[in-house]
Amino acid sequence: VEPKRYSALLVIFLKDLQPLGGLVKKVLEKKPESFEAYDDQTLKLALRFLPDFVKLLGAKNMISLAFQFLPEMKMLLFGGLPKLILLAEFTGDSEKEVGAKAKEAQEHIREFALRSRVTKNKREVEKYFSIRRQSFKLLHGHAKGLFAAPFVDDVVVKPEHLPEFLPRIRALMVPYQKQKKLIYTIAGHAGDGNFHVIPLMDLSKSSVRAVI
């Protein structure tokens, strides 16, 4: 199957996970090509190491790309970051077509009264996907002495149970992060409830190994 040439994203910012189950169902009614998600830990990494993240994107105009992160920086400074960012991708044969699909989906979820936006161009699409897909590489590059410890299996949870599941998995991980025994991110595919929990740890320390 030949992939469509154009794509646009409906980006949804969730500060409260309670609507997540119904929201996922509603978005899927518009048949997005993909429906991904990442947590606030992932977004914090991109903002914390913004210059290096921009380099990962291979951008020629670094200043221009950095300015694209102003909305996220404002959220961090004034309103706090969302707990989950959802990316619903719509593809088609023209920019006009994909933009219309994404805006139609945005209107379709208006009842949830959530903050959302539709990407305007290819660069914006790449920005959001890169946060999702390059975060582990970014984290690994800055977490000296820490290595991937995939002791948490990928999980598949029905979308309607995600508002209960995600806070519970975070509650398990956060105490160890505060003790500086691990760093973690959560990302995955909201449409089918498949999520990846990626911890980085220094397994040379017995106290850290005991966490596992």
Where are each of the predicted segments found?
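Noncatalytic alpha-helical scaffold of FAD-dependent oxidoreductases
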Residues: 1-212
